[in-house]
């Protein structure tokens, strides 16, 4: 890969996601950064303010812990910070986080005047180029303020943005978002000499489905490389995913597979479940292997491939949402039972926030110029738009909830989608999806089937939704030749939980989960290799 900045690009990024069964307090995270970068071999660590109760001083604590451990941040090991979204949370929280980064760099410079420190921040939930340019403007403002009022050197405020794009409509529109950002920066006299682009794999699956998330991420990676050539700006994709297939299937022992599946990715996240819910030696060896594997060329997509991809995304999404809209109220209740393993903002309340509701019509708009099938899908998806839903859970808790009731989310909409693609687009399109666009489909679905117990799901969730997933399962077995589940120990835990799940759902939720049930939920997470 072409060199895109003064320092090299990290291959592995350790994050603070709450997808492990181990609880990590915010006070422990500075030591965790040292463990990740020194002991586990990850090349980058992300301090996370987005949706999290991270203290203002954590960037300072992280940099100083690493300095004391002999790590020169910004050379061979790196720290980035995910700041809050000004639109989804508020401007004040974003500016506070930016000032925290600048103050951290200032403290590090006192110890090491040549240190680079933190020089990149992640902008979450990016939906427009204007958001990015406005955040750059806030960085400039915060930099001047910190210099004038806090005696922070201007050098400490040299921060670049990494846009995080994490919904299917935005991933399909990534070309316009990134082009608008680069051109907007040039209009205000600021050049973008390189750009790392964070592609979310987890949240688009929550809102739009497993297959739509996979396909949209593939297209986004391809478009990043195409735009890099067109705009003359070196770009490097980061793929943000977790251990379970619904969230990316980035797990120890599968390095060769996911590096090939998401070809072109420069940096892979190794989230908490990767590090804590697998054998430590295996996790270390896996991180080492990812670091060794060179970034390969992205999947090349022809015009026909892109058309198949967009239409298939719409078809799978339609079938996913037909279940999601029926079951999300009940799944929310189960999701609230999943233990918290980081100090997060609440989903509800004055300082909490929830994900936006799905917007199928926006995906449909991408189809309307793609022939008769595209126009029909556009009309179908417009009719599916809803104005109000219960507040959505986080993707990790949603995934954990689906596995807990015996209905892994990877199955939802997949089988019916495959059947409709064959019927409406033909065998060539079906073969493109299964063989070229998503080679790991069978392996990912076989993993999910090991935890599938739809009888239990049917006793907890609305029967109409579970019946659709049963049809999905039948088609998946037919198209992908899947084997029945063989993990009877896990099945016994699902059956043990079933009466309690029915009780909690009938009550509309509980204030406090039974400690025995909490232990069962954590044990189930350990068995599948991640809480959610």
UniProtKB/Swiss-Prot annotation:
The keyword Metal-binding does not apply. Pfam families: PEPcase_2. Its EC number is 4.1.1.31. One of its GO terms (biological process) is carbon fixation. InterPro entries: PEP_COase_arc-type (IPR007566), Pyrv/PenolPyrv_kinase-like_dom (IPR015813). It catalyses: oxaloacetate + phosphate = phosphoenolpyruvate + hydrogencarbonate. Its cofactor is Mg(2+). Keywords: Carbon dioxide fixation, Lyase, Magnesium. One of its GO terms (molecular function) is magnesium ion binding. Homotetramer. This is Phosphoenolpyruvate carboxylase.
């Amino acid at each position: 890969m072409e060199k895109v900045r003064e320092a090299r690009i990290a291959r592995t990024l350790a994050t603070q996601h709450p997808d492990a069964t181990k609880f990590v307090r915010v006070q422990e995270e500075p030591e965790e950064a040292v463990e990740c970068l020194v002991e586990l071999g990850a090349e980058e660590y992300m301090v996370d303010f987005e949706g999290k109760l991270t203290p203002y001083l954590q960037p300072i604590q992280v940099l100083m812990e690493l300095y004391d451990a002999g790590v020169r941040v910004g050379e061979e090991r790196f720290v980035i910070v995910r700041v809050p979204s000004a639109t989804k949370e508020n401007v004040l929280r974003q500016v506070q986080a930016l000032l925290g980064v600048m103050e951290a760099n200032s403290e590090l410079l006192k110890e090491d005047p040549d240190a680079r420190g933190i020089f990149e921040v992640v902008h979450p939930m990016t939906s427009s180029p204007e958001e990015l340019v406005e955040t750059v403007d806030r960085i400039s403002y915060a930099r001047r303020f910190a210099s004038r009022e806090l005696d922070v050197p201007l050098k400490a405020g040299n921060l670049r943005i990494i846009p995080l794009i994490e919904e299917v409509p935005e991933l399909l529109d990534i070309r316009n978002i990134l082009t608008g950002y680069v051109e907007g920066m040039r209009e205000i006299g600021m050049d973008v000499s390189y750009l790392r682009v964070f592609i979310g794999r987890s949240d688009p699956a929550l809102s739009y489905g497993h297959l739509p998330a996979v396909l949209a991420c593939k297209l986004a990676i391809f478009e990043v490389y195409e735009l890099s050539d067109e705009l003359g700006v070196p770009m490097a994709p980061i793929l943000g995913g977790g251990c379970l297939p619904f969230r990316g299937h980035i797990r120890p022992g599968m390095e060769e597979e996911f590096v090939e599946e998401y070809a072109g990715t420069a940096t892979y996240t190794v989230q908490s479940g990767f590090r804590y819910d697998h054998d430590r030696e295996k996790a270390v060896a896996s991180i080492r292997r990812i670091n060794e594997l060179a970034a390969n060329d992205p999947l090349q997509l022809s015009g026909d491939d892109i058309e198949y991809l967009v239409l298939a995304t719409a078809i799978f999404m339609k079938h996913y949402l037909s279940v999601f809209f029926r079951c999300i109220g009940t799944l929310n209740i189960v999701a609230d039972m999943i233990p918290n393993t980081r100090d997060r903002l609440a989903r509800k309340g004055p300082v909490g926030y929830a994900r936006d509701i799905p917007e199928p019509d926006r995906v449909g708009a991408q189809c309307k110029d793609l022939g008769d099938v595209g126009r029909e899908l556009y009309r179908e998806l417009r009719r599916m738009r809803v104005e109000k839903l219960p507040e959505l859970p986080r993707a990790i808790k949603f995934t954990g909830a689906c596995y807990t009731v015996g209905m892994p989310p990877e199955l939802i909409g997949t089988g019916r989608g495959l059947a409709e693609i064959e019927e409406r687009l033909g065998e060539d399109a079906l073969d493109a999806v299964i063989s070229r666009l998503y080679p790991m489909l069978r392996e990912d679905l076989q993993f999910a089937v090991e935890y599938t117990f739809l009888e239990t799901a049917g006793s907890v969730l609305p029967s109409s939704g579970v019946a659709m997933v049963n049809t999905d399962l039948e088609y998946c077995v037919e198209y992908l030749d899947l084997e029945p589940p063989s993990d009877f120990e896990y099945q016994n835990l699902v059956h043990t939980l079933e009466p309690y799940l029915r009780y909690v759902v009938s009550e509309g939720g509980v204030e406090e989960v039974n400690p025995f049930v909490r232990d069962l939920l954590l044990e189930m997470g350990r068995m599948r290799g991640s809480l959610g």
